[in-house]
Amino acid sequence: DAEGDKAGRRYAAYDLTKADGQGKWWEGYDPQKLYGGYNMIVPDGISSVKEMNEWHDRHDGAWMERIPEMNPEFARNWYRRCKQLIDDYKPDLIYFDDETDLPMGKYGLMATAHFYNSNMKWHNGRNEAVANAKRLPEDKQRGVVMDCERGALAGISPRPWQTCMCIGNWHYDRGLYGYNGYKTAERVVKTFVDIVSKNGNLLLSIPVRGDGSIDEKEVAFLHDFKAWLDVHGVAIFGSRPWKIFGEGEVKMQNSKSFGDNEKLQASLSEKDIRFTQKDGILYAFVLGFPSQKTVTIRSLGRNSEQMKGRKIRSIRMLGTKKKVE
């Protein structure tokens, strides 16, 4: 604390040791190992937030997940904790929330390998595990599913990938609840369909309150999202990308940083079409209600590159038995 009532005092974790946990919920754990220990310690004598920020900018202002040069034991302990988590809880998916590549160098590879090998033992030799990491180099995309946080790709990827997004913030935000700041089901559906058309998957977060519950607005969102899936899920689950992901006005680039395609995804409209295919059926999603009640899909025109040697046998609209004219 640089300027507050307790200026000069350090946070509790600085002084706590394993012995201090006796009789507490964290008994048996050493805070110095959990929080990194005595590394890059802020010196005494800093008396303003400005001065504190300047110190951090000089010494630890960059987000990094590499092995700390002055504390390699931290990375080894991180691996042991990952291994225990895998062994104790047998997760189906592990998300490494790093800035780029797998975290902690060789220990990130070791943790991922242990996850995959353990999963195969749990499933009679079949690997059903999914590990996520961000902005992976090409060679690692063959073994780890790349995640674009609140982002997207420009086109179809030959390998499965993922977007993670949240209907609000990554933590529960009472302010967003108060002014109805959650994303609508319609907004999320646009992103969802765009992702699936490009061979991607959506990891969607519904923030929980401190007691583990969700509020009634989040429940309403889930009901709306489920209602859409009840009708359109047949064109999503088990589907594959078509020859092209779609057509329209919105043009995206491959995400290079957090959230850099989110506004473009929100702007998808009736003029944007996305395709999926399954069991010999082509599905076309119109990402907005047609104001003129007509839809033109140029990629399905008789003279289009995609339709050479092909004919449309019939057209149906999901959710209704009415004839499409």
Question: What is each residue range found by the language model?
Answer:
Residues D1-E325:
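Mature catalytic domains of secreted/periplasmic carbohydrate-active enzymes
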